[in-house]
Amino acid sequence: MFDRYQREIHYLRLSVTDLCNLRCRYCMPDGVEKLEREAVLTYEEFLRLAALFARCGIDTVRVTGGEPLVRKNVAQLVAGLKATPGIHRVALTTNAVLLAEQLPALLDAGLDSVNISLDTLRPEVFRQITARDDFAAVQAGLQAALESGLPVKLNCVPQAGVNEGELEQLAALAKDNAMQVRFIEMMPIGYGAAMPCISGPELRARFARRWSELAPLSPAQEHALGDGPAVYYTVPGWQGSIGFIAAVHGKFCASCNRVRLTSQGFLRPCLASETGCDLRALLRSGADDAQLLAAIRETIWAKPREHHFNDSSMPATRGMYRIGG
């Protein structure tokens, strides 16, 4: 369906848990409180809502967290989503710590693609960012995904004074691997609000100095990679490409096509907005499908025109692990 600004909304980010097995400094550091188990939607509730979202025009679902693979039997949910009429693509965003062992079940369930979050290629920096020693497991998960033939995108958050010296090395993973390495600006949300942002335009200029033949993909090539916010570049002879997601310095709200459902069943039409609808309350109070559909449609219709990351009077205080990063 279309929102009030005539944007076609067809993409749902579905957070299945607020839990994570890493403690990334900008998302979920040590000491945060976890939700009570009953506060999180069951798979049956997620699938009921997914069927209703499909009736509203949602055809793509991305399963996120927290870390989605820490929730038991997530492949079961993927299979249920793939079996939902109207849902054509189901993707996963993961830190890949558990990916190698769970990938066979996910492939059997029909998973269409995977995004892997990795900010460094150095074990000691991985420990600094995540407070955990799981770098080898992430490497194994990434390798397993690449070998499976599943479309893979690698998401990296550039961090001043932390990983900024190895961003070219990360980008160069796209040279010999048919994947997209994407650099996402640090967003002023939750714990990331206090951290400096390396801008997308700044990083793109830096890469252009390193690779003089760096050039944008054609519109057809970009379309084949999806219709998300990333802008892609490549170097002649490379198997993959480099993407830039500049949420702060390259606002892309005019073409936004997605909404988010948190693990608690709160529908957020915009990442940076506190407005939305508590679908869990409706579900558990006995609302019928017509009432739920009306609530979903009203929330999508009311999606804000744009975020206000640059407006310090409108801070987004909720952690990314709760929103669904």
Where are these regions (language model features)?
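Auxiliary Fe-S-binding modules of radical SAM enzymes
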Residues: 1-11, 176, 186-325
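A short acidic, helix-capping loop that chelates divalent metal ions and anchors anionic groups
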Residues: 32-36, 122-129, 190-194, 278-279
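Conserved, mostly hydrophobic/aromatic
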Residues: 16, 20, 24, 63, ...
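Short, small-residue-enriched loops and turns at beta-alpha junctions
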Residues: 16, 35, 67-71, 159-162, ...
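Glycine-centered loop/turn positions within well-structured domains
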Residues: 22, 123-124, 251, 277
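Residues that scaffold the ATP/ADP-binding catalytic core of kinase and kinase-like folds
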Residues: 23, 27, 71, 124, ...
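Radical SAM/AdoMet-radical enzyme domain recognition
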Residues: 40-63, 70-184
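Canonical Radical SAM [4Fe-4S] cluster-binding loop centered on the CxxxCxxC motif
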Residues: 4-44
